[in-house]
Each structure stands twice: as C-alpha cells, then as structure tokens.
Amino acid sequence: MSKHSLKQSVRTFFYYSNMRLILLCLAASVYGCLLVYSAARSADNGMSGVIMQIGASIVGLILAMLISQVDYEDICRLWPVWSAIAVGLVLLTFTPLGLNVAGTDDTAWLGVRIGSFRLTFQPAELMKITFIITFAVHLSRVQQDIRRFKTLVLLALHAMIPIGLVFLQGDDGTALVFIMIFLSMLLVSGVNLLYYVLGLAGVCALVPLAWTYLLTDDKKARFLCILPPYIEKYLGTTGWQQYEGLKAIGSGQLTGLGYLKGGNGFSFARNNDLIF
C-alpha cells in the first residue's frame, strides 16, 4: 500500500467514524491509566503496570478501530475459529504453562517474559468476547424457536462450556460473569419469562442443599464474612478483601480522598482490587 493510499484510508476512516465514541474511548483509556498510576505508584514494580496499561490501551484502541472496519457478519462466520482459539488458550492453563498471580489461588493465567517485563494474560477474558459472538450466532439461528424448552436446553449447554472451564480453573467470580452474560443475552432475545421465574424458584430451593453438601468451608466463609458475628473471625483471611473494601469506601465515601491521596498499600493487586 502506497503512502498516499494509506493516508487516504485513514482520512476515510475518521470521516465515516463516530468521532464522539472514539473520543469517549480515548478519554476512558487515559482516565484508566491515571487511576492505575494512582493506585500502583508506590507498589514494587508499580510503574511496570502503568506502562503495560498504557501500551494495552494504545493497542486496544488501534485494534478496535481496525476491527470496526470488518463486517460483523464476516466475524460471525468465523465463530468456530474464535471458539477454538479461546478454548484452546483456556485449556493451556491446565498444563504446566498455567500460572497463578499474587493474591490468587486459581491457575487461570498464561505468561510471557519480554526483557524485564513479565506479561500475564487471562484467557477467560478473551473467551468472554468469543462467547458473546458464538452465543449471538446461536441465538440468531434459533430465534424462531426461542420459546421452546428444547431450544433453551441447547442454549444452556452452549453456555456450560465456558462456565464449566472457568469453574474448573477455580475462578468462581469470572464464572459468575459468564452466567450473567448468558442470562442477559437470553432475556433480550425474547425467552419466555416463565423460565426465569421457574429458574429462580429452583435456585432458591437448591440453596439449602448446596450450602449443606456442595460448598466448602472456604466458600461458605465468603458469604459469612460480611455478617457482624463473623467479621472479626475472618478478618485476616477470607474476609480481608471485603474489610479493605469497606475501609476504602468508608474513608473516601462518595467523593473519594482525592487523586494521589489514597493511603492503602496492603492489597496484592492494588491497581486492580482497590483502584477506587
């Protein structure tokens, strides 16, 4: 491609693009980098996280602009490719290549070292995008039968693939995100609301059984640690993050302490867990 044609392509892109959306994305990225710097500036190797955030923001904006030029139908046609890549990367976390990062107990990351920087990547984040694509394709193909129970079962089996993989990784929080994506997309697709009512009733009925026979003591503690009788008991273990969150909200309240004035330095991933 000649220099002239490249320049013309760039001009055409910006002419036909939603500049308001691009500027909002740019502003959100800059704001995010400033918050990461505020949260991580005093941490060991804190600036490496800031540099990676800036780099990721730049790469992300460029990729977003490039992908926006591709017809979404072409993206949907390649859903088997996206699924294979995302699931394959998640499966790699079950091999010796899988990593767990500081402050976590689940092996859900892959990593690569570039010079003095160690880049970590959580494949489940990519699988969120591919799940939205593949599930949207699935919904579009069964739209005429969306209210049939058999269709709902097949859709649920589709969702169980990423949800099950993430649960096996030990990342319950991300699995819940997949569940919410699944339920939200079902809701807007026109699924009979009666299924939601029946599902909610079923979950409520299963809670006592799950509490008694399925949940480990560690997972029970995650619920109990926010209740007054158990706060002190789990303060230094399971309830530590909830306690630190309450402190952060209590000290900053609605308006916050101010930029660069946050005093919490005890979080394993302060640029992530306590960024506010």
Language model region names:
Residues 2-23, 28, 34-169:
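Membrane-helix boundary/helix-loop-helix interface segments in multi-pass membrane proteins
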Residues 79-83, 195-204:
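Interfacial segments of alpha-helical transmembrane regions
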Residues 101-113, 117-120, 198-276:
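Hydrophobic, glycine- and aromatic-enriched re-entrant/interface helices and adjoining loop segments
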Residues 141-144, 151, 181, 185, ...:
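Short amphipathic alpha-helical coupling elements at transmembrane boundaries
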Residues 168, 172-176:
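Interfacial helix-loop-helix junctions of multi-pass membrane proteins
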Residues 175-187, 201-205, 223:
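Hydrophobic transmembrane alpha-helices of multi-pass, membrane-embedded glycosylation machinery
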Residues 187-196:
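Short loop segments and helix-boundary regions at transmembrane helix junctions
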